[in-house]
Amino acid sequence: MAKEDCIEMQGTILETLPNTMFRVELENGHVVTAHISGKMRKNYIRILTGDKVTVEMTPYDLSKGRIIFRSR
């Protein structure tokens, strides 16, 4: 799947789940389950409850996503 097909949205971490999964509330009010992207995992980027993040989602399943950036 090409990168252009992905939907990027801003959100806030609501809670931390097992296996580096997170529940994220998007700016439009929807709540999705997201995991950390490989580059963030490799560089040991820490994500805590309340952090602002950018989530990348596929148009095929809008209930799951990938966290690609943590805002300061």
From Swiss-Prot:
<keyword id="KW-0699">rRNA-binding</keyword>
<dbReference type="Pfam" id="PF01176">
    <property type="entry name" value="eIF-1a"/>
</dbReference>
<dbReference type="InterPro" id="IPR004368">
    <property type="entry name" value="TIF_IF1"/>
</dbReference>
<dbReference type="GO" id="GO:0043022">
    <property type="term" value="F:ribosome binding"/>
</dbReference>
<dbReference type="GO" id="GO:0019843">
    <property type="term" value="F:rRNA binding"/>
</dbReference>
<dbReference type="InterPro" id="IPR006196">
    <property type="entry name" value="RNA-binding_domain_S1_IF1"/>
</dbReference>
<comment type="similarity">
    <text>Belongs to the IF-1 family.</text>
</comment>
<dbReference type="GO" id="GO:0003743">
    <property type="term" value="F:translation initiation factor activity"/>
</dbReference>
<keyword id="KW-0396">Initiation factor</keyword>
<comment type="function">
    <text>One of the essential components for the initiation of protein synthesis. Stabilizes the binding of IF-2 and IF-3 on the 30S subunit to which N-formylmethionyl-tRNA(fMet) subsequently binds. Helps modulate mRNA selection, yielding the 30S pre-initiation complex (PIC). Upon addition of the 50S ribosomal subunit IF-1, IF-2 and IF-3 are released leaving the mature 70S translation initiation complex.</text>
</comment>
<keyword id="KW-0648">Protein biosynthesis</keyword>
<dbReference type="GO" id="GO:0005829">
    <property type="term" value="C:cytosol"/>
</dbReference>
<feature type="domain" description="S1-like">
    <location>
        <begin position="2"/>
        <end position="72"/>
    </location>
</feature>
<keyword id="KW-0963">Cytoplasm</keyword>
<comment type="subunit">
    <text>Component of the 30S ribosomal translation pre-initiation complex which assembles on the 30S ribosome in the order IF-2 and IF-3, IF-1 and N-formylmethionyl-tRNA(fMet); mRNA recruitment can occur at any time during PIC assembly.</text>
</comment>
<dbReference type="InterPro" id="IPR012340">
    <property type="entry name" value="NA-bd_OB-fold"/>
</dbReference>
<protein>
    <recommendedName>
        <fullName>Translation initiation factor IF-1</fullName>
    </recommendedName>
</protein>
<keyword id="KW-0694">RNA-binding</keyword>
<dbReference type="InterPro" id="IPR003029">
    <property type="entry name" value="S1_domain"/>
</dbReference>
